[in-house]
Curated annotation (Swiss-Prot):
MF GO annotations: DNA binding; histone H3K4 trimethyltransferase activity; histone H3K9 methyltransferase activity; promoter-specific chromatin binding; zinc ion binding
Any one GO cellular component localisation term in the record: nucleus
Protein's UniProt name: Histone-lysine N-methyltransferase SETDB1-A
Origin species: Danio rerio (Zebrafish)
Every Post-SET domain range: 1420-1436
Lineage: Eukaryota, Metazoa, Chordata, Craniata, Vertebrata
PROSITE patterns: PRE_SET, SET
């Protein structure tokens, strides 16, 4: 019994309870819980493996680059020797070995091995760092073998090449050590001297594969001076005999590597691993001579071995081919220790500019260098330049960081050797090397022989901050490249460091926190804190020399450099001949070509040639590369140049700031704020990236309103202020300093197009622009709120502070600010801001948001507006001095006007015609990501829900007008476009060629829900009957059958979705007898569609006025019934059936309907989802028979399923002057018709029906003797309706047959024995009864034209039919009947379709008015049980 009880309780569970119970049981399943844990572990393991794989691939890539660098070095050596590089050794060169093919390594195994050698060289090293990246031995061994073979071949080639160099340079008299480096100097002699090394250090021949990796990429090659001139002969070679060999014992530290340049050939830089215990530094002194000659001197490197690897740095410099006589000499290069994991590349590319070589004769610069002492963390570097500063002539790869010691060369017994025309670049230190020590400067050389003798004009620069003058190498510490990989986190700790090194390490470490707000907003980037920095620039802007600075300033300079380095963004390097966009004037950019590149302290400058040969020197932030940038380089706040069309259609270039990246909301476009105040959406090909980016990009904007808008946007990003506007909405906007009334015309993402009412001028503006009244109101109130909250006496001192920000009420231009009174809290003193800066950025409270002042359609999400403070007040208390406060932002491009002569000045369209935003139409690509492979992928779902499943968003908005709250619906497409009405939805579907979504799937009624929960069932148990689909798949949507009342089975009826002609009935469906259209726009233009014209012209038959041009479907819905019928497009039409707006009924039933058993009316139909007004529901089908044959049929059972095709008769009544008397609408009241007063005893005891509950026909036979029925002819208003609708007892219910008056017959004539439902509305006469009788006697000629027929056709749904046969009657129905012509234009056979006459909630029964005439059947009464307030109580 208990089990049966449990089963019974289980059966009584509702669907939701059952789902919850099943979910709970599933959650408690131990196997499921265990499986979830396992899946979580597997997912975490997969993520870890992905991270490991990414790291491994990165190491592989770096190793591959090292191998390629080694190959480029060898090619460079061959090029210097005038030989051709080959993949195998030549027999003439004595190679005799196996071919050494260069293998292109796909995976980067070498870098992983290279990291190991950086941490230690010997096997017994205790400080060896091993990193486990999760890669298995099996996956790494194959790649390791390939890398090892390639590196062995490359190493062999290097050794052979060194030997060959030794053979070919026998003319040198001074032997060189392998650790010495030859620095090529420009010589006045055309004779290049080839210096050969004595021998190759045996340490190069290392068998360990890991060591070979390092040896190949960092092998030592002495620098060879190969300076050839095509028009001069070689000079004799002379060498220097003086040898100075001090022994320097260095500690194991990371010695920064000094970059060097090469010209006209592949650059290279080699570092040799040595293990000698001491370093012998042998400088040489070059004596100036009228006859230029080469000075060679030897240096021996001895370095104490430590866990770090030690390499010798070499330099190579080659002058231009057209330069004058050059002098070469050799200088020593101390071994440098390079960490491979920190230095990404050890080779710098060199580009020698021809224009620079021509300037080599102009500038004469001489720098006196003090002898420097090589310490543990610094390397003595001597870089030779010719008289035009070869450092500025050469370019290094932007990816390679020049690494030099911080500060300047220290005192040493071995000074650098410099020729009489060289400008030696000082050493640099990377701000990211904390172990480097600033070296001090000595005033006198320690040895007279070490004195550096120079000629030409002497120019000594003593700078605290060394600056490198390389063309394309990264600037010194102040301009650190983001690509530099020099980090000290992986370097081994150094235990033996001096106190000076420790202090430098602290000074050079990056700042813990860099406050962007600490810098002045409208002032230029502050220079270095070092007062001794005084770079000297030559007249030709190609050479700038720096001399060592004093050690007392080293720490401060290093710290400042580190701070500046972390702020500097990546700068794009351009080459000569590159096409660019340059800033010619304010808000005007033009195309040009780079003619010359110059390196400055704060970045490169470019000499750009524009049209007509006009040349301007521009900084990097005023030049943009003329090629589309990559998406990964773009970010919010970056500076770009974009092309936009003016009002006259000309393309103009202007700079702007990017504020939106592509996303679904903006339809995958970029939003750019132009400097002239306009905003527009652009695609990637229309953008050009500015070469040099700045943190505070608004400084580049001159216009105050535009600068303020960009600044405010970036400060509150990603939560900017936005205002929600609708199409046609009235608002106010600022123009010329005053508010003007305007109307919203278009919406596009974050932009809105407004039209001013005064002159009808249109303008696209940003939704958060200060031009809008709502935005200004919100910002102004927030400022006032912040001012009151943080009010203090210090705020009164604001009058003495220069005003930098305008009030939120001010106009969009600076010239109009005088028209509006500013708010008193616009600017405050620095002291006040310093103490309250953390309090002013407060979010608006929810109470304030809900206040009436914040109601007008403004959406605020996590808004945190900064208070309006002066830029000078954003520095700390320690920095709020007069110098910082008074610092002003320099006016950019003040000198550019000098390049324009008066006769060349043109009228710039950019200044006269601002860029106009062009609205971009949608295309099929907008739905490409959601377009399904199968059209009916969501078959069986609610049609209104399907767009949401394809990433559309149905959003409800509200607005308060005159104290009343209004709601409206708008859709947001997957590409971000807002669709605010059905017309926009229709246009969007047509523009995107959407063949899987249709117009009837969208609804703008805010009270129609797409996912409304169905009302709970009245029964708790399982239904007595449930069939999943009574249509057996014939309908588009399945039609389930549910019986929760009794055990009545489903009707045994043949289901047919189409009408079936009976024997003897012929329906001509040939297209030859129909009219078709030739529309290609989806039949949206009613005036051109022939089918629409048929529907419109038919309305002329109705009395009361001209034709109704709006007749027919409106956005796939029929708002009201058309007695004259609707003509849909047919197969003869050329329009696309999927996109046509005049095809609806022919597509079949689209709603989710359900057949269910009512309580008292038999079977009925209800909807499972909300149905909007005018929606097509279904058709009424069955067998089409003739009325005459129906009269002959004596076996009339179930005649309540008969319907009359009386379309012709209904229209003829309209033609005769009848007026519609339909009372389907809830607001219509019949003023005069026959009313029924029923006095039946048993009926008074019946219960009350609920309002709008479905009713059905309950025919019964009534004895007129016992139950008196009185019929009164009086107006409806005079009759008192019964308080309670009555229910007929089942024992008295019996279906009866009722007669309906034939058309044209009088009421006293013969009557039928059955009743037929009419699809035409009842009409009332406007004329007298006599006149009506005369007209009714007039014969009907229209039907007689069809073979003299005089009777209507009837749809017999007794044995076969569809859902329409189950729809019950109601005196207040929610459906109306419409005659539709689809497959034939024969007026006798229209399709009978049901449409929703009002909004229908989910779970409501669908009903329609049968149009029975009371008293049409003699002696028989049919009671109405619809339960409506307007229920007449009787059908017949």
């Amino acid at each position: 019994m208990s089990r049966e009880k449990d089963d019974e309780n289980l059966l009584r569970m509702t669907k939701d309870d059952l789902q919850r119970w099943i979910q709970a049981e599933v959650e408690r399943n131990p196997h499921l819980m265990q499986r979830r844990e396992q899946l979580a572990q597997v997912e975490e393991w997969v993520k870890q493996k992905e991270r490991d794989s990414t790291c491994t691939r990165l190491l592989y890539s770096n190793a591959c680059e090292s191998v390629l660098e080694c190959e480029s070095v060898m090619k460079g050596l061959y090029a210097l020797l005038g030989l051709d590089y080959r993949d195998e050794d030549s027999e003439e060169e004595g190679g005799g070995g196996q071919p050494h093919d260069v293998i292109q390594i796909a995976d980067d195994e070498a870098e992983r091995r290279g990291n190991v050698i950086c941490n230690g060289e010997d096997d017994d090293n205790d400080d060896l760092v091993v990193i486990d990246l999760g890669a298995t031995k099996e996956t790494l061994e194959p790649m390791l073998e390939k890398v090892t073979v390639a590196i062995q071949k490359s190493s062999k080639l290097v050794q052979d090449l060194v030997q060959m160099v030794s053979k070919t340079s026998m003319g040198a008299t001074s032997p060189l050590s392998t650790s010495s480096s030859d620095i090529n100097r420009p010589s006045s002699s055309s004779t290049p001297e080839i210096v050969r090394p004595e021998s190759v250090t045996p340490k190069l021949e290392i068998t360990n594969s890991i060591t070979i990796v390092k040896t190949e990429s960092l092998s030592s090659v002495p620098k060879i001076s190969s300076l050839f001139n095509s028009s001069e002969q070689c000079k004799s070679i002379a060498d220097h005999d003086s040898y100075f060999k001090p022994t320097i014992k260095t500690e194991p530290e990371w010695t920064p590597l000094t970059p060097w340049e090469d010209s006209e050939s592949s650059p290279f830089e080699k570092l040799i691993k040595t293990e000698s215990q001491s370093t012998d530094v042998t400088p040489s002194v070059m004596t100036p001579n009228k006859q230029p000659e080469l000075l060679s001197f030897q240096s021996t490197t001895k370095i104490k071995p430590e866990p770090q690897s030690t390499q010798a740095n070499t330099e190579l410099s080659s002058p231009p081919s057209n330069s004058k006589l050059l002098e070469n000499h050799n200088s020593l290069s101390i071994a440098a220790i390079k960490n491979e994991s920190q230095l990404k590349a050890s080779v710098s590319e060199v580009d020698l500019l021809e224009s620079d070589s021509e300037q080599s004769d102009n500038a004469a610069t001489k720098t006196r260098f003090k002898p420097s002492e090589v310490t543990a963390s610094s390397k003595l570097k001597s870089s030779g330049d010719h008289n035009s500063a070869s450092a500025s002539l050469n370019r290094t790869d932007p990816k390679v960081r020049p690494v030099t010691p911080s500060g300047t060369p220290p005192p040493s017994k071995s000074p650098p050797a410099v020729d009489n025309t060289a400008s030696v670049e000082t050493n640099q230190t990377d701000s990211e090397l904390p172990t480097e020590t600033p070296v001090e400067e000595s005033t006198l050389p320690s040895n007279p022989k070490e004195a550096v003798i120079m000629s030409d004009a002497e120019s000594t620069d003593k700078t605290e901050k060394p600056q490198t003058r390389k063309k394309s190498s990264k600037p010194s510490v102040t301009t650190t490249s983001p690509e530099s990989r020099l980090t000290s986190s992986k370097s081994p700790p150094v235990t033996k460091t001096s106190s000076t090194q420790k202090e430098t390490a602290r000074a050079q470490s990056p700042s813990d926190s860099i406050d962007e707000s600490a810098d002045m907003e409208d002032s230029p980037d502050e220079p270095s804190n070092s007062p001794t920095e005084s770079p000297t620039k030559t007249p030709d802007k190609t050479t700038r020399n720096d001399a060592p600075a004093k050690p007392s300033k080293a720490k401060k300079s290093s710290k400042h450099s580190s701070s500046e380095s972390s702020k500097t963004l990546k700068e794009i390097k351009l080459k000569v001949g590159a096409a660019v966009l340059g800033k010619k004037r304010h808000n005007h950019w033009s195309r040009g070509t780079v003619q010359e590149v110059e390196t400055e302290d704060d970045g490169n400058t470019y000499k750009v040639e524009f049209k007509k040969g006009k040349t301007i020197v521009l900084s990097a932030n005023h030049v943009a590369a003329y090629k589309p940038p990559s998406l990964k380089d773009l970010y919010i706040g970056c500076r770009v140049v974009a092309s936009a069309k003016s009002e006259n259609g000309k393309s103009l270039y202007n700079a702007g700031v990017m504020v939106e990246l592509p996303e679904r909301k903006n339809r995958m476009r970029f939003l750019v704020f132009f400097d002239d105040g306009l905003a527009t959406y652009l695609a990637l090909p229309d953008l050009y990236f500015v070469c040099k980016q700045t943190k505070k990009v608004w400084r580049e904007i001159k216009d105050e309103s535009s600068r303020k808008q960009v600044k405010d946007y970036l400060q509150v990003y990603p939560n900017p202020i936005a205002v929600v506007l609708r199409l046609g909405q009235e608002t106010k906007a600022v123009r010329n300093g005053q508010f003007e009334d305007c109307t919203v015309l278009q919406l596009d993402g974050s932009l809105v197009q407004i039209c001013y009412k005064n002159d009808k001028q249109k303008e696209w503006i940003y939704k958060g622009s200060d031009k809008l009244e709502h935005i200004l109101t919100i910002k102004n109130r927030h400022k006032q709120h912040s001012h009151k909250k943080h009010h203090s006496p210090e705020g009164k001192t604001q009058s003495s502070q220069p005003k930098t920000l305008h009030s939120s009420k001010s106009a969009s231009t600076s010239t109009s600010s005088a028209n509006v009174s500013p708010v008193s809290s616009d600017s405050v003193s620095p002291a006040r801001v310093t103490r309250q800066s953390d309090k002013t950025k407060t979010s608006i409270s929810p109470q304030k948001i809900m206040s009436p002042a914040f109601q007008p359609k403004v959406v605020l999400q996590k808004i945190s507006l900064p208070s309006s403070i002066s830029p000078a007040a954003r520095v700390s208390n320690s920095n709020t001095n007069s110098s910082l406060i008074s610092a002003k932002r320099p006016a950019p491009d003040e000198e550019e006007d000098e390049y324009f002569s008066e006769d060349e000045v043109e009228v710039l369209e950019q200044e006269q015609n601002k860029s106009v935003y062009l609205h971009q139409r949608c295309c099929p690509a907008c739905l490409e990501e959601v377009r399904p492979h199968q059209v009916d992928i969501h078959h069986g779902k609610n049609p209104l829900l399907i767009p949401l499943l394809f990433k559309f968003r149905r959003m409800t908005a509200r607005r308060r007008i005159d104290g009343k709250l209004f709601f409206h619906i708008f859709y947001r497409s997957p590409c971000g476009r807002s669709l605010c009405d059905m017309q926009e939805v229709q246009d969007y579907l047509f523009e995107t060629r959407c063949d899987f979504l249709f117009l009837e799937m969208f609804c703008m009624d805010p009270f129609v829900l797409v996912n409304r929960a169905r009302p709970p069932s009245t029964t708790t148990g399982q239904p007595h009957l449930y069939l999943p689909d009574i249509s057996e798949g014939k309908e588009v949507m399945p039609v389930p059958c549910v019986n929760e009342v009794d055990n009545t089975l489903a009707p045994n009826v043949t289901y047919t979705k189409d009408r079936v002609p009976a024997r003897g009935v012929f329906i001509n469906t040939s297209s030859d007898f129909m009219v078709g259209c030739d529309c290609t726009d989806g039949c949206r233009d009613r005036s051109k569609c022939a089918c629409h014209k048929l529907t419109i012209e038919a309305t002329s038959l109705c009395t009361g006025g001209p034709v109704d041009v709006s007749a027919g479907y409106t956005h796939k819905r029929l708002p009201t019934s058309l007695p004259t019928g609707v003509y849909e497009c047919n197969p003869l039409c050329r329009c696309d059936p999927r996109m046509c707006s005049n095809r609806l009924v022919q597509h079949g039933m689209q709603l989710r309907l359900e057949l269910f058993m009512t309580q008292h009316k038999g079977w009925g139909i209800r909807c499972k989802d909300d149905v909007p007004k005018g929606t097509f529901v279904c058709v009424f089908t069955g067998k089409i028979v003739n009325e005459d044959k129906m009269n002959e049929d004596d076996t009339m059972s179930g005649n309540e399923y008969l319907a009359n095709l009386d379309f012709i008769e209904g229209v003829e009544k309209l033609k005769e002057g009848y007026e519609s008397e339909a009372y389907c609408s809830d607001t219509e009241v019949e003023s005069s018709k026959k009313t029924i007063t029923m006095k039946t005893g048993p009926l008074l005891k019946n219960s009350l029906y609920k309002e709008d509950s479905s009713s059905g026909e309950e025919p019964m036979e009534v004895d007129t003797a016992k139950d008196k029925v009185k019929v009164h002819d009086k107006p409806l208003g005079e009759r008192k309706l019964p308080n309670k609708p009555h229910e007929t007892p089942k024992d008295t219910q019996k279906k009866i047959s009722e007669l309906r008056k034939n058309d044209g017959q009088e009421s006293s004539g013969p009557k039928r024995c059955f009743a037929i439902k009419s699809f035409q509305r009842r009409v009332k006469p406007l004329e007298s009864t006599e006149a009506q009788k005369e007209k009714t006697k007039t014969p009907k000629n229209t039907r007689g034209l069809f073979n003299d027929e005089d009777a209507c056709y009837i749809i017999d749904a007794r044995q076969e039919g569809n859902l329409g046969r189950y729809i019950n009657h109601s005196c207040s129905p929610n459906l109306f009947v419409q005659n539709v012509f689809v497959d034939t234009h024969d007026l006798r056979f229209p399709w009978v379709a049901f449409f929703a006459s009002k909004r229908i909630k989910a779970g409501t029964e669908l009903t329609w008015d049968y149009n029975y005439e009371v008293g049409s059947v003699e002696g028989k009464v049919l009671l109405c049980c619809c339960g409506s307030l307007r229920c007449t109580g009787r059908l017949l």
